[in-house]
Amino acid sequence: SVLADLNTLYDDNPMDIDANILIHFSTNAKGTIRSSQIATGEENNLRINVYGEKGALKWEQENPNYLYHLTDDAPMRVLKSGHSYNDELSLDGTKLPPGHPEGIFDSMGNIYKGVARAIRKESFQTAEFPSIEDGVRGMDFIEKTIESNSKGNIWVELNN
């Protein structure tokens, strides 16, 4: 289920440019999405943090070649793109040697590469690109988020 607080802030711009979303997953895990186009001084600072019982992963779009792994029993590990300790899918999506930044266009190309493999009936991993079901779930999430906000920031159940 989701609970959303979406803000347009400007009468002449109907797009939601500031959002706070709470999520309850079917596994009893909880999540938070904070999105803002009005955060003073920020550029395109997309950050993804995932916290679990045994550790956490942190990734920042402005430093895309670094994945931070945190646990209670060890110092923070920094995993870098292009190194042999990464899995096959990660290495397949890396075109440059370690230390060379990959761009946003490369990430889009990786999605298209996976789609092309599927069309040609070549071997591919399901994580290479979103499925139709992923798209339907994404649209349901957007619709339920808007519904939650329009009904006064109430909890709304997702379809799947």
For the regions a protein language model found, what residue spans apply to each?
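Rossmann-like dinucleotide-binding domain that binds NAD(P)(H)
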Residues: 1-45, 133
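A short, charged, Gly/Pro-tolerant segment at domain boundaries
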Residues: 134-137, 158-160
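C-terminal glycine/acidic-rich active-site capping loop/insertion
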Residues: 3-6, 20, 24-25, 48, ...
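C-terminal hydrophobic helical "lid"/dimerization subdomain
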Residues: 135-149
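Residue-level detector of conserved, well-ordered beta-strand and adjacent loop positions
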Residues: 34, 51, 159
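Short secondary-structure junction motifs
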Residues: 45, 127, 151-153
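C-terminal capping/lid region of NAD(P)-dependent oxidoreductase domains
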Residues: 147-160
